[in-house]
């Protein structure tokens, strides 16, 4: 029993060390969800910022679609994308269509990378995304689409893509690509995906469940927990 108890203690400690970044992120999310539940004004501000980010993104993508300017915009959700943001330049600015068009202007320094949206703000630009490893993707998809799909495979982010070749607007979610979107369809999709519909209590309960699964899962299940 003495040996078994020590083995279990060491195993629990190893899990905590192994999943330390994920645990810290989940605890931060739990704290912020409690803060919003006690501060309705903060939640209202966040929703307003996200709605502005969506409307400005749709406006910018509509114009850049006409000029066939390549676009890659990542909307962060529950999973923090700090590692991805660090591959680019931290901006942390209010979202506007003009700012987005300046970033993706073909001669701009950050135009080849992705923009990261966080809590309704333009958090980073010029970021590098992981390419999809799906061998069944259509051959007509370029690097920008493969990067967008790859980002959605590796996180819960919503990724907006504008093709440089055709001007087509697409959205990648969960490894799936929705193509040929009209501006009004894009706006409706982003609102549905990014504006929380469930009460904060339900969101907090989901985070508790994720934290419990994270602490009790084995190392081999790490991909499913993220």
Residue ranges of predicted features:
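Membrane-water interface of transmembrane alpha-helices in multipass transporters/channels
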Residues: 1-10
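Divalent-cation
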Residues: 14, 19-22, 26-226
